[in-house]
Structure formats: structure tokens, C-alpha cells
From Swiss-Prot:
Coiled coil: none annotated. This is Large ribosomal subunit protein bL19. It comes from Psychrobacter arcticus (strain DSM 17307 / VKM B-2377 / 273-4). It comes from the Bacteria. Keywords: Ribonucleoprotein, Ribosomal protein. GO terms for molecular function: structural constituent of ribosome. Belongs to the bacterial ribosomal protein bL19 family. This protein is located at the 30S-50S ribosomal subunit interface and may play a role in the structure and function of the aminoacyl-tRNA binding site.
Length: 130
């Protein structure tokens, strides 16, 4: 339930951009539009989603990567027009909504297990009586 004026809700809903679903622990590649003078190019930022904030038009997420041995975090607005695309590389199996503890970890202790795809249920074949 939202306590916003109905007209504000209509305008905000028109601004929403369709994005793929992802969660904390997932490795994503965010293609960001970068303006350099007259030119505009795409810059890829690949890392692990350590936080996600779902607030409609104000939704945001934080991506962390290690670049030259230094941890780099970047926060993005989910529905921002500067984001060209978001691609989910792998799904991570985590048990927390915010993965801020990864900031203190490095190397193998900072790894995240991969979420396995659900298996098809086994079909039990009835034995044929001969």
C-alpha cells in the first residue's frame, strides 16, 4: 500500500523500465552509458550484487568487484536511463539480503556458491508383472 497521490503513482509507473530479475549474490554485467564530450559509449561493470533496495521508481542496487586488487563498489538506480542493459552471468546461493560482510573478505573466503537449477522430479516406473 502506497500513500502517494494517484497522479504521482501514474507518472512514476510510466517511468519504470523493464529489467531482468536478480538478487543479492548474483554476478551481473551492467552496461552503463558514458558521455565523453560529444561521444557516447557503453562501459561494462561486472561484479556481485551485494545489496538491492526495492522501492518502485527509487529502486537501487549495489555491485562490488575487485579491480587490480582493490574493491570497487558502485550503486545504480534500477530504472535509470544511463543503464543500457543488465545481464545476469550467474546466480549466487546466499542466505542474506545484504552482503556487506564481503567487504572484509578477500580471496577464497569471498566466494559465493552457485545456485543450482532445480532438478526434474524422478519418475518411478511401475514394475511389470510377468
Amino acid at each position: 500500500m502506497s500513500n502517494k497521490h494517484p497522479l504521482v503513482q501514474v507518472i512514476e509507473n510510466a517511468q519504470l523500465i523493464e529489467r531482468p530479475s536478480f538478487a543479492p549474490g548474483d554476478t551481473v554485467v551492467v552496461q552503463v552509458k558514458v558521455r565523453e564530450g560529444e561521444r557516447e559509449r557503453l562501459q561494462a561493470f561486472e561484479g556481485v550484487v551485494i545489496a538491492k533496495r526495492n522501492r518502485g521508481l527509487n529502486s537501487a542496487f549495489t555491485v562490488r568487484k575487485i579491480s587490480s586488487g582493490v574493491g570497487v563498489e558502485r550503486a545504480f538506480q534500477l530504472h535509470s536511463p544511463i543503464i543500457d542493459s543488465i545481464e545476469v552471468k550467474r546466480r549466487g546461493a546466499v542466505r542474506r539480503a545484504k552482503l556487506y560482510y564481503l567487504r572484509e573478505r578477500s580471496g577464497k573466503s569471498a566466494r559465493i556458491r552457485e545456485k543450482l537449477a532445480p532438478r526434474a522430479p524422478k519418475v518411478v516406473k511401475p514394475k511389470a508383472d510377468a
